[in-house]
Amino acid sequence: MSATPPRKRLSRRLTTTVAVLAAASGVLATAGPASAHHGRTVDVQMLSFNDFHGNLEPPQGSSGTVSELQPDGSKKTVPAGGVEYLASSLRAARKGHPYSVTAGAGDMVGASPLMSGMFHDEPSIEAMNKLGLDVTSVGNHEFDRGRDELIRKQKGGCHPKDGCYEKGKKFKGADFPYLAANVTDEKTGKPILKPYTVWKHNGVKIGFIGVTLKGTPDVVTAEGVKGLKFGGEVETINKYAQELDRQGVKAIVALIHEGGLPASGAYNYDCDTPGPGAGISGAIVDIAKKVTPKVDALVTGHTHAAYNCTIPDPSGAPRTVTSAASFGRLYTETTLTYDRGTKDIVRTPAKHPRAANHVVNRDQPKAPDMTALIDRWKKLAAPVANKPVGYISADINGRGSEAYEKPLGDVIADAQLEALAPADKGGAQIALMNPGGIRSDLAYKASGSEGDGVVTYGEAFTVQPFTNMMASVDLTGAQLISLLQQQVSGPNEAEPKILQVSRGLTYTLDLTKKGAARIDLSTLKLNGALIDPAKTYRVAANEFLAGGGDGFPAFKEGKNKKLTTSDVDAFIAYLTAHSSKTAPLDPPKADRITVVK
C-alpha cells in the first residue's frame, strides 16, 4: 500500500501538452508579469531539489553535510541527506498546503553510488516515484548511458542487456515527465522528450519548461549524446514560454540544469545582499537576465550549490532563482501566488515568489517505504557492495575538498598511472584526472558493519561511478603545456578546472595572473626535469577526458591511443595493493601543485 496516495492523485493532474506548435519568427513579444490582484489569489507551494545523483543512502563524508550560517557569522556543519529523510521532509512540508507541486532540475540519476548505479538507477527512479516528484528537467548525467537508456527510464521496461533484476517485476519507469526542451534529434529536429508540461489543480495552471545546459556534449561522453543536438537555454525557454502563453498558460516555471556559484557555501546565505542577485556569479546569471518575463521562477542545478536569489528579469521585475545543493541534502520551498483573474503569478516589488532552502535533517523519523526500498535493493547489491577492497587511516577528501589539488585526486591519478604504466598497458608516464569525476570522499568512519577505515567496493564505486575506460595517448610537450593551460583559459577561465596530477608532475598555479599565464611554465616538471615542448610524453586519462571533455580539446590531438582497464578497476586495484589492516593508506600531502594567490 502506498504511503503517499494524495501525491498520486495530484500527479494525475499533471497533464502534458503534446502538440508542438511552429515557433514564431522574429523577436518574441515580451509581456510583463502579473502586477495586480484582479481576482482571488491562491498560494501554490513549490518544493524542488536537484542533482540527487542516486544518493538513496545518506552520503558519506563532506558530501553528506551542509554548511549553516549562524547569527554570529560562524558556520556550523550539519549532517544531511538520505532518501528516507528526504521523503519524510517533503511529506511533512506538504501538510497544510492543498496546492503543492514538487519539481526537479536534473541529474536525478547518473554518477550514482553502487546501490543505484549497478542497477542502472532503477532504484532511484522508483524512489522518485514514491516521494511524489511531479516533474523534472533532464540534466547532463541523464545522458551518461545515451538516449535509449534515458527513454527507458521514462517509459519503463527491463534493461536490454541485464534484463529484469527481480523475478516477476518489470521496471515501470518514471511516473513523472522528464522534460528536455532543448535536446533534439539531429535528423528530425524534434525534442526527444516532452519540452514542457502543465500542472493543473482546481483551476490553477502552471507550465513547466525543462532544459539542460547547452554544453552537455562537453561534459558527457560522445557516445552518450550521439545523434543529439543541444540548443541554447534562453532561446529554447523563450520559445516554449511563448507557446504556453498562446495556449492561455500564463504562470510558467523554468527547470534549468545550469547553475551559479554563490559567494558563500552556506545554504542559508543571503544571496541578495547588498542588492538583488549580488551574491551569485556564473552561467545562470546571464541566463536569468535574458529569459523572457513570461517565466515567473527559475529552478536550477548543475553546480551543486545552494542559493535563493532575486535576479530581475528583462522587464526589471523581481524573479526568484533557486538551487538546493545536491545529493538530497536540501530542498527548496517556494511560494508562488497565483492570481485567478490574470492566471499568472504575482510578481511585484511588494509581493513576488519567495524561497527558502531547508535542510534534510537526519534527526527526523525515516520514511518506512523508503527504508523498505533501500533494504530490498541493498540485499541485491550486498554480495558486491560489501566486499572490502582497501584500508585508510583517515578521511581522504575528494568531492568535499575545496582545494584545487585534492588528496583523493592524487590517489586516483596515482592509481591510473600505476595501472597504465606497464608497456603492455600503455606505457603511461603521467596521469591526469578531471575533478568533476571525483564523486565523493573516502570516509574513515564505517558506513555499515565493515568497521572504521575499511573501504568497501561500494564506497570505491561511489567515488568513481562512471566505469569509464582508461586511455593512454602520445602528447608532445607543447600539447601537454596547451592542455594544462586550458585548465585556466578558454571556457575554463572563469571557473578553472584544475586537473589532478600523478606523482612526479609538479608546477605552480599563479592566480595573480590571467588566463593561460596562470600556469608557470618555468616550474612545470616531470620527475624534476622541465617539460620539453619537443619531447613526446605518454599521458593517461579516463576516456571522457581523453576525448576532450570538460573543455580540454588539446587531449584530442593525442596519438597512438590505447584503451585498457576501467577507472574504477584501476582505483580498486591501487587501494588493494597499497593498503592493509596493519598498514592503511594515509591521505597524501597534496603538494604537487603550488598555488600562488
Regions found by a protein language model. Give the residues of each.
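Secretory targeting and sorting signals
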Residues: 1-36
